Amino acid sequence: MSMILKEIRMNNFKSHVNSRIKFEKGIVAIIGENGSGKSSIFEAVFFALFGAGSNFNYDTIITKGKKSVYVELDFEVNGNNYKIIREYDSGRGGAKLYKNGKPYATTISAVNKAVNEILGVDRNMFLNSIYIKQGEIAKFLSLKPSEKLETVAKLLGIDEFEKCYQKMGEIVKEYEKRLERIEGELNYKENYEKELKNKMSQLEEKNKKLMEINDKLNKIKKEFEDIEKLFNEWENKKLLYEKFINKLEERKRALELKNQELKILEYDLNTVVEARETLNRHKDEYEKYKSLVDEIRKIESRLRELKSHYEDYLKLTKQLEIIKGDIEKLKEFINKSKYRDDIDNLDTLLNKIKDEIERVETIKDLLEELKNLNEEIEKIEKYKRICEECKEYYEKYLELEEKAVEYNKLTLEYITLLQEKKSIEKNINDLETRINKLLEETKNIDIESIENSLKEIEEKKKVLENLQKEKIELNKKLGEINSEIKRLKKILDELKEVEGKCPLCKTPIDENKKMELINQHKTQLNNKYTELEEINKKIREIEKDIEKLKKEIDKEENLKTLKTLYLEKQSQIEELELKLKNYKEQLDEINKKISNYVINGKPVDEILEDIKSQLNKFKNFYNQYLSAVSYLNSVDEEGIRNRIKEIENIVSGWNKEKCREELNKLREDEREINRLKDKLNELKNKEKELIEIENRRSLKFDKYKEYLGLTEKLEELKNIKDGLEEIYNICNSKILAIDNIKRKYNKEDIEIYLNNKILEVNKEINDIEERISYINQKLDEINYNEEEHKKIKELYENKRQELDNVREQKTEIETGIEYLKKDVESLKARLKEMSNLEKEKEKLTKFVEYLDKVRRIFGRNGFQAYLREKYVPLIQKYLNEAFSEFDLPYSFVELTKDFEVRVHAPNGVLTIDNLSGGEQIAVALSLRLAIANALIGNRVECIILDEPTVYLDENRRAKLAEIFRKVKSIPQMIIITHHRELEDVADVIINVKKDGNVSKVKING
C-alpha cells in the first residue's frame, strides 16, 4: 500500500482540543509520557480513514464537556492527494472525501467504500499490515514455535479459517445430536401402533355401554317427573301453612308488646299521683331547708375569704416566739467570747493577724523550695556519673543502628517477595482445588438428557395453554348459569310472598295459578343445578390435568438452571486453567529473585534479627546516655547553688514544725474574731425582724376575731339543716320522678295524657285478639301434615339421587369416549410424525456427511495448509529484502512452512535463539515488514509502530533504534514511544505533553 500520511487536524478528539500535526517522510518519532495523548493521534488517523465501527459510542472519543468532534486527514496514494473530513455534532455524523482538491464522496457509506478501494485494504487488514501494535516485536522474540505460528496466522487472516473449522464442528455436532434424538424417537413407533389398536378396542366397548345407560336414564326420568309433581303440591301447601303460622306469631308478639305497654302506662300514672300527695304534705319543711342552705353557703363563702388572714395571724405568732429564742442565744454567745471587750476594734485585730499569717506562709514556701533545690543538685551529680558510664555503649549503638537501616530495607523487599510467593502458591492451590471441584461437579450432569427434557416441556406448555383456555370458557358459562339461578330464586321468593298480583306481569293471580308458576320455576331451577354440576365436574377434570402438567412444567426452571450451571462451570474451568499457567510462571520468576536476598547462606531477615538483638542489648545504655545529656543541658547548676545560699540567709532560725504551730495559732484567732462578727450582725438583724413581725400581726387581729365568731354560727345552722335533710331528700326524689315521666312522654299535663293513652291501648289489644282468632280458623282449613310431607320429600330425593347417579355414569362414559378419541387422534398424528421423522433422518444423514467434507477443507491440513504454502515464499522474499538492509554477515533467511525462521551463515544454519539481541530484533522487524508487504501485495511506504520499545531492556532499545536508522526501504516510519533514545534516529520529533486535561503538540524538525 503506497500511502504517505501528510497532515492531521483534531478538534475535541479525546484530549486533543485543537491539535495540528504535519507528517514528513523519514522517521517521525511521536514522544510523550504515558497518558499524554500520543496514542490518540493514531486513533484519530484510524477514525479518519475507517470511521465508526459497529456498536461505536462517540462519547468515547469526544473531549469531556464537549458535544462535537472534528478530524481532518491529508494523505497521498499513488501520486494522488486525498483529504478526509469526519465530524459529529449533537447526535449527527458526517464524512467527506476530496481527491486532488475536488469532492470525491460526500456520505459516510460512500467515503467508507471509497477508502477501502483507494487503500486496497479493509480496517482489519490495515491494522495487521501497516500498524505494529504495542510490544509486538518484543513479544515475538519470546514466543514458543507454536505461538509464533499462531501469531503469523492471525496477522495473515489464516486463523479465520480455523475459526470456521471449529464453528462448523459445533454445527456438525448439533446435527448429529438431532439425528440421535430422531433415532431415539423412532424406537417408539412399534409401541405407538400397538397402543392405537388397544385404544380403538376400548372405544368400541365404551359406545356399547353408552347406549345401555341412555335407555336406563329415560326410564328413571319418567318416574322422577311423577313424584316431582306430587312433591311440588305438598311444597305449595307447606308454603301457605308457614305463611299463616308466621302471621300468627307476628300477631302474638304484637299482643304481648301492647300488654307490656299498658302495664308501664298504669305504673307511671300511679307514680305521678303518689308523688303529688307527698309534696303537698311536706311543703313548709322543704322551703325552710332551702333557706338554711342559702345562709350556710354565704357564711362558708365569708370564712373562705377570712381563712388566709386567720392562718397568717397564727403563723406570725409562732414566728415571734422563735425569733425571741434566737435573740437570747446570740446574746449568750457574745457574752462568753474572749474578745467581748474589744468589739469596737475587731477589724484592726483581724488585719494584724492576716499580715502575720502571710509572713509565716512565705517562710514555709522558702523552706520547701530549699529542699527541692538540694534534691536537684543531687540529681545533677547522678546524671554526670551516668554520662561517663554509658558513653562507650552509646557510640556502639549508633554504628549498629546505621546497619539496621540498610538491612531493614533489604528485609522489606525480601518479605514482600515471600508474601508474593505465598500468595501465588495459595492462588495455585486454590485454583487446582476449584478446577478439581468444578470437574467433579460437572461429571454427573447429563447435558444431552437435560436438553431433551426442555424440548418436551415446551410441548407440554402448548397443551397447558389449550386446557386453560377451555377452563376460562367453562367458567364464563358457570357465571351465566349462576346468574340465571339467582334470577329464578328471586322469582320463587317473590311468588311465595305474593298476595293478589303476579310479581312478573302484575296481573291478578289466585292460589292455583301461583302454585303453577312456582312449580315451573322450580323445574327450571333444578335443570340449571344439573347443568351447573356437569360443568363443575368437567372443570375439576381439567384442573387435575392442568395440575399434572404444571408439575411437569415446574421442572423447567431447575433444568434450565442446571444447563446454565454446566455451561458456566465449563467456561470457568478453561479460565481457571489459563490463570493457573500464569501463576506457575510468576512463581518461577519470584523464586529466582528470592535467591538474591541470601548472604553467606543466611537470609537478610535473620541478619537483621541479629543486629536488632545487639541493639536491644545496648538500647538501655543508649537511652540512659541520651536522657542524662538532655537533662544536664536543660538545667542551670550555678543558678541553683546561688539560690540555695540566698534562701538559707532568709529562713535562718525557722523550720517546718515551728511554721505549722505558729500558723495554727494565728488561724484559730482569725476564725474566733470572724465568728464573733457574724453573731453581732445576726443579732442586729433578728431584733429588726422582731419589730416588723409584731407590726404585721396587729393588722390581722380584727379579721382573726371575725373568723372565730362565724365558725361558731356555722356549726349551729348545720345542726338545724341536718334535722330537715331526710324530708328534703324525699321531696326531691318525688319531684325528679314526676320530671322524668314528663320528659319520657314529652307532656306537661301528664296525668290527663296517661289516662287517655291507657284507654287507647286497651282498644288496640281487643283488635289484635280478633285477628289471632281469624288466623287459627284458616290453619284448620289448610290441614297440613308435616310427617306426610317428609315421606313424600324422601321419595323425591331418593329418585332424584338415582337420576343424578345415572347421569353421572353417562357423563363418565362420554368423558372416557372423548379421551379415547383424543388419544386415537394423538396416536395417529404421532405415527404420521414418525413417518416424517424417517424422511428427515435420511436427509440429515446425507447433510451431515456433506458438512463434514466441507469442514475438512477448512481444516489445518486443508485450505489453511494451502494458504501457508502460498504465503511462505512471498513472505520469505520480502523478509530477505528487508533483512539485507541491516548489513549483517548472513547470506539468506529461510522461512519454513510453520513460519520458523532459519538464518543461513557461513558456518551453518542458525535459529533465531542462536542470534545476538540486536540480530533477533532485526529478524523480528524484517518478518513483520514482510508480512505487511505480503498482505498488501506491493511495497509498504508507511508503517506505524506503537510503543515498539516496551518490554525491551536498555540494551535492546538501543539496538532497535540502530536498526530503525538502517531501514531505507520504507519512505515513512511513524514511531509512538515514551523512550527518549529514539530521538537520536528520528528525522522529525513530535513532542506531546498534557497541560491539565488538554494535550499539546510541538514539532521539532
Swiss-Prot record:
- The secretion signal range is none
Source organism superkingdom: Archaea
Binding, ATP: K14, G35, S36, G37, K38, S39, S40, I62, T63, K64, Q134
Which cofactors are reported in the record for this sequence? Zn(2+)
Q: How is the cofactor bound?
A: Binds 1 zinc ion per homodimer.
Which GO CC terms are listed, alphabetically?
A: DNA repair complex
InterPro entries registered for this protein in UniProt: AAA+_ATPase (IPR003593), P-loop_NTPase (IPR027417), Rad50/SbcC_AAA (IPR038729), Rad50_ATPase_archaeal (IPR022982), Zn_hook_RAD50 (IPR013134)
Q: Where does Zn(2+) bind?
A: C502, C505
One example of a Gene Ontology biological process annotation: double-strand break repair
Keyword terms of this UniProt record: ATP-binding, Coiled coil, DNA damage, DNA repair, Hydrolase, Metal-binding, Nucleotide-binding, Zinc
The similarity comment for this entry is: Belongs to the SMC family. RAD50 subfamily.
Report the function annotation for this chain: Part of the Rad50/Mre11 complex, which is involved in the early steps of DNA double-strand break (DSB) repair. The complex may facilitate opening of the processed DNA ends to aid in the recruitment of HerA and NurA. Rad50 controls the balance between DNA end bridging and DNA resection via ATP-dependent structural rearrangements of the Rad50/Mre11 complex.
* Description of how the protein assembles with itself and partners: Homodimer. Forms a heterotetramer composed of two Mre11 subunits and two Rad50 subunits.
Q: Supply the HAMAP family for this chain.
A: RAD50
Protein name in UniProt: DNA double-strand break repair Rad50 ATPase
Tell me the organism.
Methanocaldococcus jannaschii (strain ATCC 43067 / DSM 2661 / JAL-1 / JCM 10045 / NBRC 100440) (Methanococcus jannaschii)
State the encoding gene.
rad50
